[in-house]
Amino acid sequence: LGWEILPEEHAARVGGGDFGRTHPDGIWGDYIREVNPAGETVWEWHMHENIEIEKYPNAPMSGTGEWGHPNSVMLNHDGDVMVSWRHNNLIAVIDKKTGQFNFEWCGFELGFQHDFQVLENGNYMVFVNQDPGPGAGSKVLEFDPATKETVWDYRGKPRYTFHSPFISGAQRLWSGNTLICEGMWGRIFEVTPDKELVWEYVSPYFT
């Protein structure tokens, strides 16, 4: 996963964003490159060449100097590429054969998300940094990719007790429990499927 300066004709089509942060050379976009053990490129995908730029503007409260801001990439069970783009509130799966999305979810309800991944049961999971609703809070969301219906989620009770507006992630453990990183506060904790806290660590260092 890498960043690149967009060609001017593509950069001119990028919309949205609120902040005035810019790069002197233009607007950053991104690409994905797969290499073999010898370091040779075997597959490459550039966002601005494969999707409709106007359909995915930067969300409000995101910068204008970068389009997308991808923050996670992995393969699903079919070998296709799962990507999270924070600035667009977009998660999608790229068909490696066509270069097009075969799954996408774009909306404010994803809340500048991180750590989009597939679970062993075939469901998808994502860390929603800014979970919409009254008060500040985050959410770990497991959902059925065929319907986008919630299978399981975790929120703080009350909401503000679990909130990281940036970084962060979650991992489903072999036991069925979920390990969660609340990145802003250096907190790692484990919860059961019934959302019971069974382990917790808070780093004494803050950077």
Predicted features, each with a name:
Residues 1-207:
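Histidine-/acidic-rich catalytic cores in large beta-rich domains
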